[in-house]
Regions:
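Conserved C-terminal alpha-helix-loop-beta "cap" of PLP-dependent enzymes
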Residues: 147, 151, 155-265, 271-279, ...
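Charge-dense polyanion-binding interfaces
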Residues: 293-297
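Conserved PLP-enzyme active-site core in the AAT-like
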Residues: 1-155
């Protein structure tokens, strides 16, 4: 919120603020405070809640819909029992309904998929009609068990909030170990056919949903135990020298000819025309050493 206020004061021409909450890793922003600051400067708040479609049904206090955002976008297919490509826009401010409708007329197809729309309605009705106490209990027990693993660390809400976050979505399962993220991802696939959502330089991300039962959590925990046994305590894994580091060093101080990013998730590290700094080169070197896929170089 402090960053938003500083930007709004420095740039009075700003019309809207776009915030991603929760993040890929499940970090929740204080949308209520951000909205208060932005609205005081007559700035709209648009929240990318793509990974939080389940929040209104499980943790409504974490959903931007209930925190003062003007527009909230959710990808139902990410965390609800809905088909890929299904998403919704929540227009929470009455005076924006008409402008959003006009924009949709321009950008949306005039022949929408009724199969998708029926599936979306079914998914929302499923969430509204069910109680998820059993799921939450299973998830809590699973997370408590994971905390006992000596070699694999799972991100906990307390640590995330202590680092300054407003909240944490505990359905997001984020693990790190003494090996790079891609190596842990491959290990989970090899030991138990577990398909991770993504791997970062030092972590992997898995998504739990309300359709996961106790048996699913038990199977995942068994796989984590096998991976934990395979990891040695001696594995400090000194930083490897980045393959092609000399070529990367030559990029320092030059202009990027194309966007440079790691995929997934696809967020730009450097955009076209921006200066590639020495710090950026160091970061790219670390990503490459970890085995991540860098695009644009």
């Amino acid at each position: 919120a402090d960053d938003v206020e500083r930007l709004c004061e420095s740039h009075p021409e700003i019309a809207a603020v776009v915030v991603t909450s929760p993040t890929y890793e499940g970090v929740i922003s204080d949308i209520a405070q951000i909205a208060r600051v932005a609205h005081a400067h007559h700035v709209r708040v648009i929240v990318d809640e793509a990974h939080g479609a389940h929040l209104p049904f499980i943790k409504p206090e974490y959903s931007a819909i209930h925190m003062g955002a003007d527009v909230v976008v959710q990808s139902l297919h990410k965390t609800l029992p809905a088909m890929t490509q299904t998403a919704v826009i929540h227009v929470c401010t009455e005076e924006l309904v008409k402008p959003v409708e006009q924009a949709l007329e321009i950008f949306l197809s005039s022949s929408p998929s009724y199969i998708f729309m029926m599936n979306m309605e079914a998914a929302i009705c499923y969430m509204a009609d069910h109680d998820f106490t059993e799921y939450e209990n299973n998830l809590r027990e699973f997370r408590e068990n994971c905390a006992k693993l000596p070699q694999i660390t799972m991100i906990e809400k307390e640590a995330v909030c202590a680092a300054g976050a407003y909240g944490y979505d505990e359905t997001r399962l984020v693990y790190s170990a003494a090996v790079p993220g891609p190596e842990l991802l491959a290990m989970l696939a090899d030991k138990g056919d577990v398909v991770c959502e993504m791997a970062g330089r030092k972590h992997v991300v898995l998504i739990s949903t309300v359709r996961d039962g106790q048996e699913d959590f038990e199977q995942l925990y068994r796989t984590l135990q096998m991976c934990d046994v395979a990891l040695t305590k001696e594995g400090d894994h000194e930083k490897e020298r980045c393959a092609g580091q000399e070529e990367l060093q030559k990029l320092a101080g030059t202009l990027a000819r194309a966007p440079i990013y790691v995929y997934p998730p696809g967020s730009y590290i450097v955009n076209t025309g921006e200066i590639i700094t020495a710090e950026t080169v160091e970061k790219l070197c670390a990503y490459q050493a970890a085995g991540l896929h860098i695009r644009g170089i």
